[in-house]
Amino acid sequence: CLHFHYAHAVPQARLGYSVFNSDGEWCGVILFSNGANQFIASSFSMVQGQVMELVRVALNGKQECTSQALAMALKLLKIDAPAVRLVVSYADRNQGHIGTIYQATNWYYLGEFASERGIMLNGKLTHRRSINSKYGTSTIDWLREHVDPKAEVIKGETKIKYVFPLDKRCMKTIKSMSKPYPKR
């Protein structure tokens, strides 16, 4: 993750799968988590544990086909986490992404959503979760009063949301929510 993904960070993951090419060379990882948003399942009328987030596709380029690697990871996820009915992922417009890999693997596009890059705190852009972990809160008013009077939320480009159903029972709902794919 540190070397093969633009974020240069390893996210918290519940399940991860190594990717190898046909020569047996390790090519990277595909990681899934419960998601940063504790309400990730509610917009789909599901409960926590039925929805996971694809948090990282970090590959070194030696794999034969990224879409095939992702498809295999989704099949393994379905086996290893049978309670999971849906996978959510986001394409990051801040990186110029529109979700080409999700389009290539037939995910459903749900739209674009406001994105926060982080909070400028003491002159440094910091992720809200890191601030919350350190101070027990990340509310701007509290941070301005106790840490940095100049603290401010930094907005980013929108994130593009895609979902991949693992359970046929949720297909009708997902299809009704889906929109045409965005283009460059």
Please provide the spans of the model-predicted regions:
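Short hydrophobic/aromatic beta-strand or adjacent loop that forms the aromatic wall/cage
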Residues: R14, E157-Y162
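Acyl-donor binding region in acyl/amide transferases
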Residues: S33-E152
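Hydrophobic helices that insert into or interface with lipid environments
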Residues: G136-T137, D167-S176
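Short amphipathic alpha-helix that is part of the acyltransferase structural core
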Residues: C1-Q12
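C-terminal accessory module of base-excision DNA glycosylases/AP lyases that mediates lesion recognition
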Residues: E152, E157-K159, C170
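Short, cationic low-complexity segments
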Residues: K175-R184
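Conserved beta-hairpin
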Residues: A13-N34
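Structured loops at beta-to-helix junctions and adjacent beta-edge loops in soluble globular domains
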Residues: S22, S33, V57, P165-D167
